[in-house]
Amino acid sequence: MKALKRILSTVFLTITIFAAASAQTLLGKKFTATAEAEALLDLTASSPGTSWLTAGAEAATATIFVDGRKHQDVILFSGAKPFTYKLLLGHVAAGEHSLRIDFNREQSAAKATTINIADAKVTLLDRTQPEFQAVAHTPFLFARANTIGKFSDVPLLMYYETVKEGALTTYRYTVIISNEDGGTQTAALMARWGRTTDIEWVVDVQVDAQGKVVNSTYQGVQHETKTFQGKREADHPLFLIKSDNNNFADDGESPMRFTLRPVGVDLSKHSREWVMDQHPWTHTIMAEEMTREGKITAERTLGARIADLRTYLYVDVASNQENGALLSFALKLKNDPKWYTSDLGIGYYKIERSGYFRTTIRLPQGVTPDKIERLSARCDLTGNPRSKEEISKASAARCELNAINSVFLLDERFQPGRTLPIRTGNVTLPFGESVEIRV
């Protein structure tokens, strides 16, 4: 019996020590809501000795508790630099509430030893404030299981668009994720999307004038649009990031959860990538993850590896492609006879979709804006039309180039530099034609 007691005592001591070692409380505070509200948190924090660029020292992780219950995890991707993480604490009733923030050693990088909290500001958003409904229906995301502990494919930013139809309002939520381990190859991402982050539509939530949910549809695995039938936490729908290309499931959980505070945007005249430009740190995290994962090379290759992201020219465009037309761009440098293309001569790398979008052109290392001479846009045709029907359709193929909204290189911090003075009015390009634009 004494031996058993000694064993149990040893086990209890081991568990206690492990619990103390795996979590450390960094901050505890109270806050009071005078009415039901959505609680917001501005967490300004840093983790000395960590960097998203460095394997083994990628980031520290903080775990946040509300009223004693685990609410979310925060991966401090900004590393040793103080950064304000804008988060949601969810729905709170009127009354006093508690906030606790722990250093989660288990989910932190091996070389992460502590977290410094400079500020943890709680604000409350009640029903009288215009953005309440958009915030109250923001989805909460459980991490994709195979990313936990890998510091890869991390949700960075959530945004929403608002569409009003009579008495109904639809909030469309989209998440920007640091990378995409599955899906489109990296070289194709840069040509077709102008980025290596993953920007994924999550869910549309339609509400009536009282804020009651009328309908919710989301992006399921294989990009299937599905009706949401899962759980909600108050009005927040819960999703698991399910597939390697970051599509979602409305059932299932994982040990890590992210509850990002969304920013409202109007994309009626902008690309989705423009949201990244408004939050330029997302470009930095994108570049650091690519470098750490060995996806950057000086070699001219296709597939998973690309050049330093600062060697690309980023071109933001408004254009409509009709009847199988494809759009691509090329650039000429001063004192250089070559033209550098966005599609790398590959049909799949050309852009067939219409609207506002982004592409990139890979340039030689060390190119600066003053070395750029001319930009051209080219309209091509899908496939090899042979039948009478195919030829008839192809004959009407054209690209309606409406605007070039911005053209830039990334600076030394991997953030967008000044926009180059390249503008064009509406230009109609039948297939097989191109237009040249001087800088």
Where are these regions (language model features)?
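Boundary at the C-terminal end of the N-terminal hydrophobic targeting segment
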Residues: 19-23
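Beta-strand-rich ligand-recognition modules
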Residues: 24-26, 44-124, 337-371, 382-387
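Short edge beta-strand/loop segments characteristic of extracellular beta-sandwich folds
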Residues: 30, 40-46, 314-320
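Extended extracellular/luminal ectodomain segments enriched in beta-structured repeat modules
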Residues: 33-42, 94, 168, 306-313
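Generic short beta-strand segments
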Residues: 43-48, 102-106, 172-187
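N-terminal "first-domain core" detector
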Residues: 118-182
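Domain-length functional cores that host ligand/cofactor binding and catalytic or interaction surfaces
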Residues: 135, 163-170, 176-187, 191-201, ...
